[in-house]
């Protein structure tokens, strides 16, 4: 039996709605879904969506003995959908901390995190700007990589949520080597790809056009590529970002230098179907690739597709790992 820990994220957003809709469509055989979240939020979403699932409330993940849907009821706020606050931010943190404890103790096979608000978790006193940095620190991960993916395309990021003006200074030969080595290793282990084909993007227009438009390609990216090839890793020279994705069928993963460079094409190809996975953690962690959806919360129009994909990916990765 595959046992999945699912954090509800911010209970005032669309999370309860999309989770019920997703669970209604996901497979039930030999899988237990353990939700860390608010009973009141889920009950409210049940009335909103008309999705009436058999969810058993338990005190601990240790109480799970067979397949099914379970709830560990924590920080049970009487929320108004679309109305977020420090309290809903705090609730998000409580769900996350409890789930991560169980995952680190190997009581669950994977972690699926539903969206949180960076603003409200930080205003509630949480010292991290999001899930990933927290998960890396509490798990002791020395190196990790953010990968967004769908069935057509996978993209890893060298830099993530930083201002564009700070990107060049954050790109180093050492960082590229470290992250690509991690990606190569994790794609072998997690996805069963014996020799991943990796495409790396340049930073500048036309990958600098031989140093005529910037020099990061010649001074940083190409030397990193040379070292990686000496390791036996199959990786391209830095590709011109504006045309690189035309060849997406030729590669297992792209490595982008910054957030929008990699995610604009991904979301164009895979809108509502993309999934976030964190490589380098000692456990499987996936999440849907969207936010809390405060603006549409409570309207019963939220699309659960990305959550379904996130859960299905976690199940697949668990089975590949066996």
From Swiss-Prot:
**Assigned EC number:** 1.1.1.262
- Where, by residue number, does a divalent metal cation bind? 161, 206, 259
Keywords linked to the UniProt accession: Cytoplasm, Metal-binding, NAD, NADP, Oxidoreductase, Pyridoxine biosynthesis
Please name the pathway.
Cofactor biosynthesis; pyridoxine 5'-phosphate biosynthesis; pyridoxine 5'-phosphate from D-erythrose 4-phosphate: step 4/5
**Annotated InterPro entries:** PdxA_fam
Q: Does the keyword NADP apply?
A: yes
Q: Can you list the GO cellular component terms from the UniProt entry?
A: cytoplasm
Localization per Swiss-Prot or TrEMBL: Cytoplasm
Source domain of life: Bacteria
In the record, biological process GO terms are: pyridoxine biosynthetic process
Reactions this protein catalyses: 4-(phosphooxy)-L-threonine + NAD(+) = 3-amino-2-oxopropyl phosphate + CO2 + NADH
Which terms in the Gene Ontology molecular function aspect does this entry carry?
Answer: 4-hydroxythreonine-4-phosphate dehydrogenase activity; metal ion binding; NAD binding
Q: How is the cofactor bound?
A: Binds 1 divalent metal cation per subunit.
Q: Which cofactor does it need?
A: a divalent metal cation
Residues annotated for substrate binding in this entry: 131-132, 267, 276, 285
EC main class here is oxidoreductase
Additional comments on file? The active site is located at the dimer interface.
Q: Which family does it belong to?
A: Belongs to the PdxA family.
Extract the PANTHER family matched here. 4-HYDROXYTHREONINE-4-PHOSPHATE DEHYDROGENASE, D-THREONATE 4-PHOSPHATE DEHYDROGENASE
**What job does the chain carry out?**
Catalyzes the NAD(P)-dependent oxidation of 4-(phosphooxy)-L-threonine (HTP) into 2-amino-3-oxo-4-(phosphooxy)butyric acid which spontaneously decarboxylates to form 3-amino-2-oxopropyl phosphate (AHAP).
NCBIfam families attached to this UniProt entry: pdxA
Q: How does it assemble?
A: Homodimer.
**Know the name of this protein?**
4-hydroxythreonine-4-phosphate dehydrogenase
Name the species this protein comes from.
Sulfurihydrogenibium sp. (strain YO3AOP1)
Q: Which gene encodes it?
A: pdxA
């Amino acid at each position: 039996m595959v046992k999945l820990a699912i954090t509800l994220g911010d209970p005032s957003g669309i999370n309860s709605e999309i989770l019920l809709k997703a669970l209604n469509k996901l497979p039930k055989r030999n899988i237990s879904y353990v939700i860390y979240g608010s009973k009141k939020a889920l009950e409210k979403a049940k009335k909103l969506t008309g999705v009436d699932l058999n969810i058993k409330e338990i005190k601990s993940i240790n109480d799970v003995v067979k397949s099914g849907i379970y709830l560990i009821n924590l920080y049970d706020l009487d929320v108004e959908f679309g109305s977020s606050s420090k309290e809903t931010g705090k609730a998000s943190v409580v769900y996350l901390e409890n789930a991560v404890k169980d995952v680190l103790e190997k009581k669950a096979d994977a972690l699926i995190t539903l969206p949180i608000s960076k603003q409200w978790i930080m205003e509630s006193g949480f010292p991290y700007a999001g899930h990933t940095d927290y998960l890396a620190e509490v798990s002791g991960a020395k190196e990790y990589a953010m990968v967004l993916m769908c069935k057509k395309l996978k993209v890893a990021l060298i830099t993530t949520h930083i201002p564009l003006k700070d990107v060049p200074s954050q790109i180093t030969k050492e960082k590229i080597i470290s992250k690509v080595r991690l990606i190569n290793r994790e794609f072998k282990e997690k996805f069963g790809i014996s020799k991943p084909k990796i495409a790396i993007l340049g930073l500048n227009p036309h990958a600098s056009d031989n140093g005529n438009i910037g020099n990061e390609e010649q001074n940083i990216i190409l030397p990193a590529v040379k070292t990686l090839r000496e390791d036996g890793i199959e990786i391209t020279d830095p590709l011109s970002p504006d045309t690189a994705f035309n060849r997406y069928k030729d590669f297992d993963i792209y490595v982008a230098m910054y957030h929008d460079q990699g995610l604009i094409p991904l979301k164009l190809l895979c809108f509502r179907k993309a999934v976030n996975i964190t490589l380098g953690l000692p456990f499987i962690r996936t999440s849907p690739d969207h936010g809390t959806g405060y603006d549409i919360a409570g309207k019963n129009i939220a699309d659960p597709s990305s959550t379904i994909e996130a859960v299905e990916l976690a199940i697949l990765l668990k089975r590949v790992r066996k």
